From Swiss-Prot:
Residues 1-16 form the signal peptide. The gene is Acp98AB. The keyword Signal applies. This is Accessory gland protein 98AB. Responsible for physiological and behavioral changes in mated female flies. Keywords: Behavior, Secreted, Signal.
Length: 25
């Protein structure tokens, strides 16, 4: 369960980073 939460957190961070990059660029 902990691994799943960690994976989701990493995915959310990556998604936010991509989203910010797209908005900036």
């Amino acid at each position: 369960m902990k691994l799943l939460i960690l994976f989701l957190a990493a995915l959310g961070a990556a998604s936010a980073r991509i989203r910010g990059h797209t908005i900036k660029g």
